[in-house]
Design a protein with these regions (language model features):
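Bacterial Sec-dependent N-terminal signal peptides
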Residues: 1-32
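Beta-propeller blade termini and top-face loops
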Residues: 25-770
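Bulky hydrophobic/aromatic "packing anchor" residues in well-ordered structure
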Residues: 91, 472, 776, 829-830
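Right-handed parallel beta-helix/beta-solenoid
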Residues: 183, 272, 770-797, 801, ...
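Structural motif
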Residues: 309, 811-812
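Beta-solenoid repeat scaffold
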Residues: 807, 816-839
Length: 839
């Protein structure tokens, strides 16, 4: 009797949240370059709204202790290697960056540089940014917003977590991290493991090297904190009237501290003991009706202070008398982008340490002034940053500016810039222009890309995906794997889901925001609009910011897309036809009629007429006749959760079996039906093998083994080999295994062999070992190679081709092998009654 043994590799991630924020907007977005940034204020806000919507409860909140409790649960889970091996390969991109809010040059070594990514952790360069290495991937949180050295030594470092620049609570960070070994290892300061430190937006260190351990922190809890013992304890020195986002200590007079908030600026002249409100709105003071305020002292003039205020699309204010009076230096330049502006999101200001009249301010692009802000000259143009910065400019959306450690205004005016595209450098900040003088430092080995989704050709020759503010990217090879640096960025803006024509890999599909489907006929070199007839496209009231579409696994000319309605094309997206109407609407916070939107789609592999869809309000429906009739299945058998549907997976081998996942911090995020939705079972696991309470983003069947299920969450990938009755997380056998502590946005297969995890912060990972189909026949001669034509004779022979920890499943039938097979001291298999289990 012939039997098939299936070997598979999978690593389980141990991940942490990207700090998120909730914003509400409903304006349309155009995909033309000039209009993208005019509407960037809208879609930057929509990005946070989209990310928050699936995670928040009915009150728009995520539990502040949700991350901690989920991690504690994972620590208690049994450790095993269910449903596969443990190894992954990082496949990039390493030449396309992601959002950076922290840059830290080493004052003792100008070649040494650290950056903090908002979802990719801390990275280090020892050659001025030419190459980068991730630091301590498995620390508590990778949402880095600020970094400083201890005043006394650069061997002690502090990193803030939690990106809190929005209007209301998002997902929590993990307080403040500290390293005492020059950044090699990082640990959470226990004193910051509480709700007051869930968003730590900025750190500042006392400038005196004799003041060891004195650090300041500002948070979204409206607090200004100070520690004098290196973070063992913190004292709230002041409670602000709004979220505190920036803090600076005067390098010449450390008793003077300035704090920028959302709409407020506060100044202290006594080390933070007392504070004055500089935004009182009275004569000679700052206005009281502004937005986010970024602040800076002038090292060459202790009486001079600058503020970049999110007001009137960008205002620069200056004080020449240490805050006694203030003067408006510039307004109307519109450096925060089109109305209403996005200074709440990207806002930064830097002053030349040598000359207090020379400044650079950043919003969407960068502007330079040599007269104290009265005149601004644009020095970067986001449209000229393309394909990893090859066109020589800075990426859009500026978050941080800092001079090089060996900066000299005359002989070495080198300055670094952190933005949504990573980090760029101007060797001469006083001569750099829109498209001249820029060096992209995120173009070789900085892997912090934020994917929403992706797809792979069956042979792996093309892998595509959509990124936050770095749009549609593509890996392409003509043969063997050519490395994570071989990615190409076709366009700019925000990307989303992706698909590849499996019969003709020159035909690719991607999207711009709000369901604007794009098509490439040249393997991703360029894209064109492909949403004719799709009337939901481009309207935030009708489609999600990142809206779902799916290619038919039976015919690549067929695709299905979802907005308020469901749409289908049968001619390679040349035009679209509605196959389901809207299911309902509501009045949103702006008073507009907004429709419930499709959030996920799956199509049966064996029958194109069978389509399942899920919605933001928990509605789940199916059709068996390509949309002529639809049946709601979420109310059957007691009903599914009334929450955002994050994903649907139809068993490719049996269309009656379907998994549906839901967003939020709940213990019922994974559901299974064995009979096409007639009955439902909560498959979040059985104690002690149950899943933690956390966000589930994606679910996939193994193509060759329907018992094996994989989910991607905000805390990693979990696997089950019994259809979700029990779940496992892999143990740490040999150091840090697998992808790092960042969110898995989507799981997808490369053919039937490799599982790929698209992460929102560290690019893509792919399982190192493909599932191999091995044949065993007890009547075969010894010496087979495991192929169908030349099978192995025994399970023992077959096991020799599998790696350590492999799981072997034998198809139905009886097998008489009883020999115990050792797997490199990491477990063994026992064959009993035709089944094989890991012990």
């Amino acid at each position: 009797m012939m039997k098939r043994l299936i070997f598979s590799g999978l690593l389980f991630l141990s991940l942490s949240f990207l700090a998120l924020n909730f914003f509400n907007t409903n304006e349309n977005v155009s995909e033309s370059q000039d209009e993208i940034k005019l509407d960037k204020a809208t879609y930057a806000a929509e990005y946070y709204k989209y990310r928050m919507a699936s995670r928040a409860d009915a009150n728009g909140r995520v539990p502040m202790d949700g991350l901690l409790r989920a991690k504690e649960h994972i620590a208690r889970m049994p450790q095993s290697r269910d449903a596969g091996l443990w190894e992954w390969d990082w496949i990039g991109p390493s030449n396309i960056g992601g959002r950076i809010r922290a840059i830290l040059p080493d004052p003792n070594n100008a070649s040494k540089l650290w950056i903090g990514s908002v979802s990719g952790g801390i990275w280090k360069s020892t050659n001025s940014g030419t190459t980068w290495t991730p630091v301590n991937d498995f620390m508590t949180n990778l949402a880095i917003t600020s970094m400083v050295f201890d005043p006394a030594t650069t061997s002690i470092m502090y990193a803030a977590t939690g990106e809190g620049f929005g209007n209301s609570d998002g997902l929590p960070g993990a307080g403040i991290l500290k390293s005492t070994d020059s950044g090699l290892t990082w640990n959470q300061l226990e004193s910051t493991n509480n709700a007051n430190f869930t968003y730590v937006n900025r750190l500042a260190a006392h400038p005196d090297p004799d003041s060891a351990g004195i650090i300041y922190a500002v948070t979204n809890a409206n607090r200004v904190y100070k520690t004098i013992d290196g973070g063992v304890t913190w004292v709230n020195k002041f409670t602000t009237a709004s979220n505190a986002v920036d803090i600076r200590v005067d390098q010449n007079n450390p008793n003077e501290i300035i704090v920028g908030c959302k709409s407020k600026v506060y100044l202290s002249t006594d080390y933070g003991e007392t504070w004055s409100n500089e935004t009182s709105g009275v004569a000679n003071k700052l206005p009281s009706d502004g937005g986010r305020c970024e602040v800076t002292f002038c090292p060459s003039n202790s009486n001079r202070i600058y503020v970049s205020m999110n007001r009137n699309l960008g205002e620069i204010w200056r004080s020449n008398d240490n805050g006694v009076t203030w003067q408006l230096r510039n307004t109307g330049t519109n450096y925060f982008g089109g109305a209403p502006g996005q200074g709440w999101y990207d806002n930064t200001i830097w002053v030349n340490p040598a000359y207090s009249t020379q400044i650079v301010v950043g919003g969407v692009d960068l502007w330079r002034s040599t007269d104290g802000g009265t005149t601004l000259t644009k020095i970067s143009r986001w449209q000229d940053y393309h394909n990893g910065g090859a066109a020589n400019s800075a990426h859009a959306d500026q978050h941080f500016i800092i001079e090089a450690a060996d900066y000299n205004s005359t002989t070495n005016p080198k300055v670094y810039f952190g933005n949504d595209g990573g980090i760029q450098k101007a060797n001469n900040v006083w001569t750099v222009s829109n498209n001249s003088g820029w060096t992209n430092l995120a173009g070789t080995s900085l892997g912090i890309s934020q994917f929403f989704g992706g797809a792979a050709a069956n042979d792996g020759s093309i892998i595509v995906g959509g990124l936050q503010d770095n749009d549609k990217v593509r890996y392409k090879s003509s043969g063997s794997w050519s490395g994570p640096n071989n990615w190409y960025q076709a366009t700019t803006g925000d990307g989303g889901y992706a698909a590849i024509n499996y019969n003709n890999t020159s035909i690719l599909y991607g999207e711009y925001v709000y369901l604007k489907i794009k098509k490439s006929t040249n393997s991703g070199d360029s894209y064109s609009n492909s949403y004719s007839g799709l009337s939901d496209a481009g309207n935030s009231l009708l489609a999600l910011f990142i809206a779902p579409f799916s290619m038919d696994p039976n015919n690549p000319a067929y695709l299905v897309a979802g907005g308020s309605k469901i749409w289908r094309t049968t001619n390679n997206a040349s035009n679209w036809t509605q196959i389901r109407g809207a299911i309902g609407s509501f009045i949103n916070g702006n008073g507009d009629i907004e429709f419930y939107k499709c959030s996920t789609i799956d199509i049966d592999k064996g029958n194109s007429a069978v389509i399942w869809v899920g919605y933001t309000n928990g509605n789940v429906a199916k059709t068996s006749n390509t949309g002529i009739d639809w049946t709601r299945v979420d109310a059957n058998d007691g009903g599914l959760p009334n929450r955002y549907v994050t994903d649907i997976a139809i068993n490719p081998n049996n269309s009656n079996e379907v998994f549906v996942t839901f967003g939020g911090y709940n213990n019922d995020d994974v559901w299974y039906t064995p009979d096409a939705g007639v009955n439902w079972e909560n498959r979040s696991g059985t104690v002690p093998n149950d899943l933690p309470v956390l966000q589930v983003n994606t679910v996939r069947y193994h193509p060759a083994n329907s018992n094996w299920i994989y989910i991607g969450t905000d805390l990693g990938v979990f696997a089950s080999q019994d259809r979700g009755v029990n779940w496992s997380v892999v143990t740490n056998f040999n150091g840090n295994e697998g992808p790092v502590n960042t969110e898995v946005a989507e799981l997808f297969w490369q053919g039937n062999e490799f599982l790929i995890a698209a992460t929102h912060g560290r690019g893509m990972y792919r399982t190192a070992a493909p599932p191999a189909v091995i044949y065993v026949n007890s009547t075969a001669p010894i010496g087979g190679n495991g192929s169908q034509a030349s099978p192995f004779k025994t399970v023992y022979e077959a096991s020799q081709v599998a790696g350590p920890g492999a799981t072997i499943s034998i198809e139905s039938g009886t097998y008489t092998e009883t020999q115990i097979v050792t797997f490199l001291n990491e477990g063994y298999i026992i064959v009993t009654n035709g089944s094989v289990v890991i012990q």
